Amino acid sequence: MSNSIGRNVLHQSLLCSTVFEHQSNRHSSGIPANSLFQAVSINQPAGASAARKSPLSTKFYGTSLNARPKMAMGRHRPVLITPRAVLAVDSASELAGKFNLEGNVELQITVGAPTPGSLTQVNIEISYSSNSLLLHWGAIRDKKEKWVLPSRPPDGTKILKNRALRTPFVSSGSKSLVKLEIDDPAIEAVEFLILDEAQNKWFKNNGANFHVKLPSERSLIQNVSVPEDLVQTQAYLRWERKGKQIYTPEQEKEEYEAARTELLEEIVRGTSVEDLRAKLTNKNDRQEIKESSSHGTKNAIPDDLVQIQSYIRWERAGKPNYSADQQLREFEEARKELQSELEKGISLDEIWKKITKGEIQTKVSDQLKTKKYFRTERIQRKQRDFMQILNKHVAEPTEKKNISVEPKALTPVELFVGATEEQEGDSILNKKIYKLAGKELLVLVHKPGGKTKIHLATDGKEPLILHWALSKKAGEWLAPPPSVLPAGSVLLSGSVETTFTTSSLADLPYQVQSIEIEIEEEGYVGMPSVLQSGGNWIKNKGSDFYVDFSYESKQVQQDFGDGKGTAKALLEKIAGLEIEAQKSFMHRFNIAADLIQEAKEAGELGFAGILVWMRFMATRQLIWNKNYNVKPREISKAQDRLTDLLQNVYISNPEYREIVRMILSTVGRGGEGDVGQRIRDEILVIQRNNNCKGGMMEEWHQKLHNNTSPDDVIICQALIDYIKSDFDISAYWKTLNDNGITKERLLSYDRAIHSEPNFRRDQKDGLLRDLGNYMRTLKAVHSGADLESAITNCLGYRSEGQGFMVGVQINPIPNLPSGFPELLQFVSEHVEDRNVEALLEGLLEARQEIRPLLCKHNDRLKDLLFLDIALESSVRTAIEKGYEELNEAGPEKIMYFVSLILENLALSLDDNEDLIYCLKGWSNALSMSKSKSDNWALFAKSVLDRTRLALAGKADWYQKVLQPSAEYLGTLLSVDKWAVDIFTEEMIRAGSAAALSLLLNRLDPVLRKTASLGSWQVISPVEVFGYVAVVDELLAVQDKSYDQPTILLARRVKGEEEIPHGTVAVLTADMPDVLSHVSVRARNCKVCFATCFDPNILADLQSNEGKMLHLKPTSADIAYSVVEGSELQDSSSANLKEEDGPSSSVALVKKQFAGRYAITSDEFTGELVGAKSRNIAYLKGKVPSWIGIPTSVALPFGVFEKVLSDDINQAVAEKLQILKQKLGEEDHSALREIRETVLQMKAPNQLVQELKTEMKSSGMPWPGDEGEQRWEQAWMAIKKVWASKWNERAFFSTRRVKLDHEYLCMAVLVQEIINADYAFVIHTTNPSSGDSSEIYAEVVKGLGETLVGAYPGRALSFVCKKNDLKSPRVLGYPSKPIGLFIRRSIIFRSDSNGEDLEGYAGAGLYDSVPMDEAEKVVLDYSSDHLITDGHFQQSILSSIARAGCEIEELFGSAQDIEGVVRDGKIYVVQTRPQM
């Protein structure tokens, strides 16, 4: 570079200050610039668009959409360029600036000026050495404050949210250096800050960015510029050359600036602008010819007018996301519409007036300045590990919490009440207890035999006088007739004074002071009174006491229930304080704050009680204000106190966070002093500034002064809507009524609002401005969970004072995540979008960003909590608004939305482990779908099923924890019954779970169709006739006996129920495993059993309740029809004959004790053990070595009876005999008592010794070697197996087939538990199709009890042809959320003589009990090799199928086999003939 050029460039080098990006305008360097699409005609005459002055800026700010040559580009919002101070530098030097920073740190910047085509170098050196020193920087281009990211950042540079770069300094001794190379001639300056990340320390230029102006090639040609239409044309040609790709916003910007750079370089090389225009225009000859026919007329319409029309079309269409081609078409369609108007003779002036009527001009202008249309902006979500948001904070189980539900100690007055009520019988009319300075006053009214009798009693010790009268109408004081005066009364003028006397009722340990008044005369309606004690008058809160004779209190008749499942004492305390709480929000919030510690001691149910109370308040079920004036600042202070205590609980007790969040959502944020006072002051300023001091505004002012409430937020919004609708009063009432405020409610306020608003047109602008500002003040106190208010509180704001009105300054929350304010800005700008995908992503990214801050103490924690609650709620609102967007969406988009809502739900729960694994499952399903995996829909269906189970579990939690408190407290507070009944339902609807459930319902049929699953899964295909009966759950009717063939439609089937007698079919929406107990019994008993996935089919079946249906199943479907006429009688008798047949041949043979307490597997015979033990012994030594058989011993038949007859168990035997007699008298409660009694048996020494010997000789561990306690555990497990003979399911099953229950004998098979990776059940003939050439199997993770027991969800299921065992085919992926895992242990299996009888399905009726309790583990299938590794899956499933074939071949018949997989090896633990 020559010295002259260098000096010239360096003379122009500027080092300037700009506002630091996080504090700058909305689209400064922290936020991606928004753009719009506008049409520009390349060869448009200069004056063509000047025919009408545009309401929009015609200056070009970035890229645009060309109508010709059709290039889609963006446009930046114009920003105010702040004046910059110039730093003078030595013209002969490349030193651009030198600074002394805080702490004697020196910063030096040098710039190397380029020659044409070379790089510009910026060297930044700081006398500060740190391994964590970063340059936070970006570049300025085209005089815009918005940062761009240069294409050649130094090594190690990271991109921060596509908004800034962070480059590490290189340490050199005591200094640190960074060298930047800029190759884009359009870049005019570099801006930066320096950050010591480890210290969180920023180095700034007097609080702003350092700004280094760069020398540029453009400085050599200052008098030459490139016309924007040529840049647009060049950008289009680049776009066309690259195949008309759809660009992201960032790519659009880069392409546009690259086009500009190319043209600038041409000019530097000496090409004139005219030559460039000719060159570019020639390249567009083809397009010119194509469009020549309409070119002249198109150019007659200003492009900015076309732009407005295209925006209106886009908004009318629901703001869809358009592709590049669609954008072009839309723009041309808008031009055609306008051209059509012109051809009708309408002038451009008239079109301008028409389409810019009302607010459309401002609205479009704002939209074009700040937003893209045709394409929604997106934030770049960070890649996160879902496990980072895992919560496992589980509240202590209610039953373990020391919550007393015993009746509290009764006061003397309550004891008096009880005794009096018992004495007087059912004639009680009215009862009330008043609180008097720590004592109680009872008033009890009853009418025995037509008389009116009043009892008054108090536990006060001081002498007390009742000053009273009677009344025949309200408010009257009449002297009573002398005949009714109690002894010792003094008759005065118009009243009586009677002294309370000490009295005691029988069996009452306390004395009380009481009065009894008896009135025989009719006509009196009540008794007014006051009390006198020690010369002082005592009133009822300033009024007379009044006893109503005619009012029959509902509370006297109300059954309050026993308060079970609630923090009963706390709820009763709340109910007792409600009279005080009704005075004002200040009273209510202070009372709630006083109760927080008591709620904490009561645990989860305590906070549930507070939540229910606050929810009743928020839904206007409780009185907000009654005869009490309170200043707004007093309300906000009380809110502040309550929310401070709640935030402390949130930190100290993470297990209650979910409930605390819900409580906070019902309470405003509050605030000390000024925030609340502003409500009172600002309304006066609004009235004064806008000259509206009378009418409705004055009435509202009086209400605000005396008792502001959340209703005021709605009233303010209603006024704004009224003004915006051009003073349409119906808009005012619509907003009020939509939010639950009626005329009656307005009139019910202590300071009633009688009038409607009536403003003048000249007040419009001022009122909209001032009421809009006032809304922020109201929301700051009352609407903590309002999104706009919550964002404002977090980012800070300042409202200036005016005269007497105080100012308010809320500081920004410190240490927010980098870029977080811009993220909130994005959310604010897009919150009204109809296409909600980008908004949902922004809301969830914001929640993820602040989550770490919510887990630690922070002085502004509650502001962050209210923000998080608002963001969570906005997700729900957005998805409800976005349902329309999903109408035509494919499964991938619906799955993505499901994952977003699921993430939102997981971020709010105390225990979200199950949801996290569902979330990971959806992520896998999306990946499989995008990669076109064969089984993606099948896998996604399993994740959907599991997600539904998780939602059902959450609903059960609400029902268990909240509903009992709602019912008990609702009864105590006389809340409307409908509000109590739907309490849980409304709480669920208020969260994301309901929206998620709706999306799952929409996705389910899509997945079933894609995976070819159909509407049914037929578990037992039996053709039947039967009458339809609808039940909630099969368990509730398993003991019932139907006297006609019945088709049960059961909402819930767990899997271990018994099928009721007389049932010919069970149809359910639930999903029991195909090989669960109930499924096996259905097949064995020839009962049709199927799951229906289609709610419409289920609804149709339910509509036929009471009618007879004919079910005709195939292996994959069920056809059904209503049976009518003569067919009805024939089908009924056919069913009954079929049902009565087989049971008569079933019989049991009584087994005897054979003299041995324990035997080894070599000694297993039919006389000693059941088929389960014999079959496992038969396999030993016969199966291939790759199939393991566990070592077994047994306690044979007769041991139970022998132990019971031992002298040490005489008392147990006698008690059992009595209970059996009770059972014989049809008292089925004896079954439970029998089981409990069996567990009291003691083990004879001989049994212990024999069992020990046989187990050790077989190589099994003896529990007693680990201590006596371990043997006791084993003995208890043995007794539980014996006791299961009397479980309800087994007892009714044997009785149904007329088996003699006394003949049923129970051996116990003892096996060592194999700590399994997986458990499986095989049916060697496919049970659904009956295909003997095909094996069907189910596999679960962990122990097999989750497969055969009542554990929700489905197992992995597969089939495999016996002639192709290496090719298993997966039918369904697992959805079971829980796996059971156990330490090395012993299992004691039931082995009765009644399990495998021909014609009787006895398998699975009795219990197998492990010595140790299995651990429940929430399963993560995304890390399970059986699901994710195709080769491993094929290997394991093939081995299971091969084992099934081997065992079937050994027995020569179809088998029902149970086994486990451990470290890839197959173990078979039992087998029986497949029935």
Curated annotation (Swiss-Prot):
Swiss-Prot/TrEMBL induction comment: Down-regulated upon carbohydrate starvation.
EC number: 2.7.9.4
Gene Ontology molecular function: alpha-glucan, water dikinase activity; ATP binding; metal ion binding
Gene3D superfamilies (alphabetical): ATP-grasp fold, A domain, ATP-grasp fold, B domain
Active-site residues from the entry: 1077 (tele-phosphohistidine intermediate)
Top-rank taxon, per record: Eukaryota
Cofactor: Mg(2+)
Cellular localization per UniProt: Plastid, Chloroplast
Pfam families xrefs: DUF7067, GWD1_pHisD, Ig_N_CWD1, PPDK_N
Cellular component GO terms, alphabetical: chloroplast
Keyword line: ATP-binding, Carbohydrate metabolism, Chloroplast, Kinase, Magnesium, Metal-binding, Nucleotide-binding, Plastid, Transferase, Transit peptide
Purpose: Acts as an overall regulator of starch mobilization. Required for starch degradation, suggesting that the phosphate content of starch regulates its degradability.
Similarity remark: Belongs to the PEP-utilizing enzyme family.
Subunit structure and binding partners: Homodimer.
Domain comment in the entry: The N-terminal domain contains the alpha-glucan binding site, the central domain the pyrophosphate/phosphate carrier histidine, and the C-terminal domain the ATP binding site.
Miscellaneous information on this protein: The reaction takes place in three steps, mediated by a phosphocarrier histidine residue located on the surface of the central domain. The two first partial reactions are catalyzed at an active site located on the C-terminal domain, and the third partial reaction is catalyzed at an active site located on the N-terminal domain. For catalytic turnover, the central domain swivels from the concave surface of the C-terminal domain to that of the N-terminal domain.
The protein's name: Alpha-glucan water dikinase, chloroplastic
Source organism of this protein record: Citrus reticulata (Tangerine)
